[in-house]
Regions:
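Amphipathic alpha-helical dimerization/coiled-coil segments
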Residues: 2-22, 43, 93-133
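N-terminal helix-turn-helix DNA-binding core of bacterial DNA-binding proteins
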Residues: 21-62, 88-97
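Base-recognition residues in the alpha-helical recognition helix of bacterial helix-turn-helix
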Residues: 40, 68-69
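Alpha-helical residues within the helix-turn-helix
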Residues: 57, 68, 74-75
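Conserved H-loop
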Residues: 65
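Beta-hairpin "wing" of winged helix-turn-helix
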Residues: 74-84, 91
């Protein structure tokens, strides 16, 4: 495996740093179990969408709490809403967020795959015996 030069490595790290910055709001939003449940409920509803009352019936939280989580999901660009009369229906729309997260994961994976194994053997042999290998 070719050992990347220091400039190339620093450029890759800079790209990853920028990608983490872009993905942090998405990852933070996804880290909450209630928001995960809401996303799954909305995914199940498909193109029908759901209003706050329907979502509240499926999750043991108050309407204001559900509304709070919906606002966070909407602000993060993971759901969209559509008003029908007096009702607001919510729909999953997580494509952009997932695309950014997938790009980050792939960039990190490519960097890690290109780490020179000889350098690891020489400088950090303990990494080869870690339980996650």
């Amino acid at each position: 495996m070719v050992k990347p030069n220091e400039t190339e490595f620093k450029q890759k790290i800079s790209i990853i740093r920028d990608q983490f910055e872009v993905c942090t709001p998405y990852l933070t939003t996804l880290s909450d179990p209630v928001r995960q449940k809401i996303l799954l409920i909305l995914a199940e509803s498909g193109t029908d969408g759901m209003d706050v009352q329907d979502i509240t019936a499926k999750i043991s939280l108050s309407r204001p709490a559900i509304s709070h989580h919906l606002k966070i999901l909407k602000d993060a660009g993971m759901i969209i809403s559509h008003k029908k009369g007096t009702q607001v229906y919510y729909f999953i729309y997580i494509y952009k967020a997932l695309d950014k997260i997938i790009n980050l994961v792939n960039t990190v994976l490519n960097l890690v795959k290109n780490i020179d194994m000889e350098s690891i053997k020489e400088k950090a042999p303990w990494m080869l015996n870690s339980p996650s290998n």
